[in-house]
Amino acid sequence: MDIRKIKKLIELVEESGISELEISEGEESVRISRAAPAASFPVMQQAYAAPMMQQPAQSNAAAPATVPSMEAPAAAEISGHIVRSPMVGTFYRTPSPDAKAFIEVGQKVNVGDTLCIVEAMKMMNQIEADKSGTVKAILVESGQPVEFDEPLVVIE
């Protein structure tokens, strides 16, 4: 399924009153949900994070101390224009394992410059800058899975 077609479907869901849309073409399928159901996922993840922190606290006191300290700077760090993932997939900073990264922190980018790649269903989708500016932060590590609408890059 073409990325342009997926973007059109996302716009259709945003503009209409429907809460979820699922389309299948052959072996490929896409499910798009409105923001209300997606917002419930982080709440559930936070609910699961608390018990996970309590269990290591009994066996190892250092582990819970590092988790909150990593979350606090990330929340404070996100200011400026945020480029978000248009799909669920795997984030890559480089076009190939040996190649130089598309962007680095501090680099100036223009509208249309490739920032990264999100691989979805064996298709490499280039994520382009929708604003000119300077890369302030890259929020995801290369090879890490990303969710729909997850912040990837901050441009100032």
Curated annotation (Swiss-Prot):
Alphabetized CDD domains for the sequence: biotinyl_domain
Database matches in InterPro entries: AcCoA_biotinCC, Biotin_BS, Biotin_Carboxyl_Carrier/Decarb, Biotin_lipoyl, Single_hybrid_motif
GO cellular component, one term: cytoplasm
Pfam families per record: Biotin_lipoyl (PF00364)
Single GO term (MF): acetyl-CoA carboxylase activity
PTM-bearing positions, type N6-biotinyllysine: 122
Keyword field contains Lipid metabolism: yes
Domain Biotinyl-binding: from-to ranges: 73-156
Lineage: superkingdom: Bacteria
GO biological process annotation, one example: fatty acid biosynthetic process
Associated pathway: Lipid metabolism; fatty acid biosynthesis
UniProt keyword list: Biotin, Fatty acid biosynthesis, Fatty acid metabolism, Lipid biosynthesis, Lipid metabolism
Subunit structure: Homodimer.
Function: This protein is a component of the acetyl coenzyme A carboxylase complex; first, biotin carboxylase catalyzes the carboxylation of the carrier protein and then the transcarboxylase transfers the carboxyl group to form malonyl-CoA.
PANTHER family assigned: OXALOACETATE DECARBOXYLASE ALPHA CHAIN
The protein, known as: Biotin carboxyl carrier protein of acetyl-CoA carboxylase
Organism: Escherichia coli (strain K12)
Gene symbol of the encoding locus: accB
